[in-house]
Amino acid sequence: MEDKFSNRNTSIEFLRLWFMLLIVLIHAYCHGSGLNYEYLYSLGSDWSTAHHLGLLCIGKCGVTGFMFISGYYGVSLKWNKLASMIAMLLFYVLLLTCFGGYSVSDMLKIIFHPWDEWWFVSSYMVICFLSPLLNQGISALGKRQFGITIIGLLFYEYVGKFISQDNSHDTMFLLTIYLCARYIRMYIAPPDIPTINIKTYRNR
């Protein structure tokens, strides 16, 4: 389904780049400093070390923000885009194997079971594969049904995981953010947001 809101606001594109930078910085902070996520979560229990957890939370806003923008404008299944993502994944796997101290078994795990360390790439690809089904389903649902679905997903992701103390992010988390953004774009955001067609602008 072609999104009728395909024109992009250049300010939003810069915001997307900012969210990507936050994602890179938080990974550099966690992995570059040798700290794991479980240890960073434990630092929040003491005010003297809580700022470390605060930095982690700010970085995680990059994941939510990036996926929100993707959902706001819509994701479509494009094989060339998926091929580029897979090629990028294989490139970084090769770099980590050659220079990052990863073994061959680690490399195979990343390629064939990338849901742990590389969860975002895997989850985003799943949403790309599901996008035709998602777009058709959203079109078939009314505003009320779509809203009830969003409320249920938000309850599961935030209330349910808060109760279970599960801090993980997964495909369901990205899907929830994606659908929330679609709902806001369809039913809440004003339809006359000024936009610039970036492709047309570049061809001038």
Listing of model-derived features with the role each one plays in the protein:
Residues 154-158:
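Membrane-interface alpha helices of multi-pass inner-membrane proteins
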Residues 1-153, 194-201:
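Membrane-cytosol interface segments of multi-pass membrane proteins
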Residues 143-146, 165-172:
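Short, aromatic-rich membrane-interface segments at the entry and exit
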Residues 109-115, 159-169:
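Membrane-interface helix caps and helix-loop-helix hairpins in membrane proteins
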Residues 98-102, 159-164, 182-192:
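Juxtamembrane membrane-interface segments at transmembrane alpha-helix termini
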